Amino acid sequence: MNAGRGDELTVAEPTGPCAAASVSPRALPGPADPLLDLRLASLREEQPRESSPVTGPIPLRRRRIGDSSLLVFPVAINGTGFGRTIDAVSAGGILDAYRGFGGNFIDTSSAAAGGRSESIIGDWMRSRRARSDVVIATRVGSGTGSPGVSQAAISTAVDRCLERLGTDHVDLLYLDTDDPSVSFEETLLAVDALIGAGKVRFFGLAAHAENRLVEARVITAQLGVPPVVALQVHYSLLRRDLFEGTLAGVVAEQGLGVTARFPLGAGFLGGKYRSAVDLAACPRGRSAVTPPTRRRLRVLAVLSQIARERHVAPATVALAWLLAKPRVVAPVPGVSGPEQVLDLVAAPSVQLTRHEVAALDRVSS
């Protein structure tokens, strides 16, 4: 166990509200997808036993989120595209595949698709009777429903989240807006009230600088209320500056768990966009990494070389690099289809050597 990277546990027979079911996607309730089954089978065959031992559910490694009791699979599923670019049927297939591989950590936002993302996740949990198998994280504070971090705004936003999710609590609530016009005391007391009411188990921050993390720790100690346990931050091989440095130092000092947003650079690190021509031809590519700099293409080249040597996808290596970093509990990649899930959940099984990590560090610095 490496305390610098968060507590890790290998669970043989998971039980309890945070444990994932040890089942294959084919065994899950709901309509079968033979094309997905064939794709997953072919992907398994591509993984050599020595580097990515994928023969069914991924070995159930769990990481603890900060000082909480939440034990999660080291790769979360980003559900913010559900209801926007991903319809309910495709979202269900993604979640089925993820759960089938042992995944139990679903991340979304109250603002995603105007709340539709939470509704789709809630419908899926009900249809699969999966609420006790998964850890649900959502964010409040932005969007049009109940924006802001005042006591009234947070309380209203969480109640609406719970209604859409069809549950009586969220496991991890992030505040994704930092509003200096609202006292931090009011915001933190509002969260404390929700925790006391059983509507929220733990909370984190998602749009806050290091000085606000320090301030939050001081205020929660003075008020005697639960502290921040997690930070969600934009962090990837393409964007290291927002986290590494002073912010990472504060996170380590406070023992927070980090979840990394945009860990694949909006798809660029998945290897789809291998040239400036590819990027120019794809609107998503242009919006993700404009301009297509030489540095970014060099990062992709080194990433792809390591992936080829290990017989895994570039996305798998990009996530494995993050998982090798201190305090990172789980990257939160987006996914557009069930066939992509294996490349993501395979990342915890890929233990990069220090030379591979160093090569990626150098090219991305």
Locations of the language-model features?
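Beta/alpha (TIM)-barrel catalytic core signal, keyed to glycine-rich beta->alpha loops juxtaposed to Asp/Glu
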Residues: 15, 20, 28, 32-35, ...
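Active-site mouth loops of central-metabolism enzymes
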Residues: 78-89, 140-152, 176-181
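Active-site groove signature of glycoside hydrolases
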Residues: 162-183
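Short, acidic/polar
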Residues: 86-98, 149-165, 213-218
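Short acidic capping loops at alpha-helix termini that bridge into adjacent secondary structure
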Residues: 73-74, 107, 131-134, 168-172, ...
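A short, structured active-site edge motif that brings together acidic residues
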Residues: 132-144, 231-235
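Acidic (Asp/Glu)-rich catalytic clusters
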Residues: 66-69, 100, 122-133, 162-166, ...
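N-terminal binding-site loop/beta-alpha segment at the start of enzyme catalytic domains
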Residues: 4-134
